[in-house]
Amino acid sequence: MYAVVRTGSKQYRVRVGDVIEVEKLPVEPGQAVTLEEVLLVERDGTVTVGQPVVPGARVVARVLDQVKGPKLIVFKMKPKTRYRRKTGHRQRYTRLQVEAIEVGAAS
């Protein structure tokens, strides 16, 4: 059984037990998170596609950690003027472990 969920303007294909990194969510490590935007669910060979979401479906996950991604260097330069700017950016992510995929009343 797997599901496709949308969070932080990105889509993730998840199974129970998977660990995924999503855009930062305002939660503490150890808390449970419910992802309501389930776009697709596959169960026992039957695929249910939402229009746009599957009604009654949700993914329950546990927050493992708040982490930062790799540093990206942003370098601006204008020729012949000695203009140079170098900055870095590290995106923040929330690491989740999928605990359950629930569809309708039965899960």
Curated annotation (Swiss-Prot):
It comes from Thermomicrobium roseum (strain ATCC 27502 / DSM 5159 / P-2). This protein binds to 23S rRNA in the presence of protein L20. Belongs to the bacterial ribosomal protein bL21 family. Part of the 50S ribosomal subunit. Contacts protein L20. The keyword RNA-binding applies. HAMAP family: Ribosomal_bL21. PANTHER family: 50S RIBOSOMAL PROTEIN L21 (PTHR21349), LARGE RIBOSOMAL SUBUNIT PROTEIN BL21M (PTHR21349:SF0). The keyword Cell membrane does not apply. This is Large ribosomal subunit protein bL21. Coiled coil: none annotated. One of its GO terms (cellular component) is ribonucleoprotein complex. One of its GO terms (molecular function) is structural constituent of ribosome.
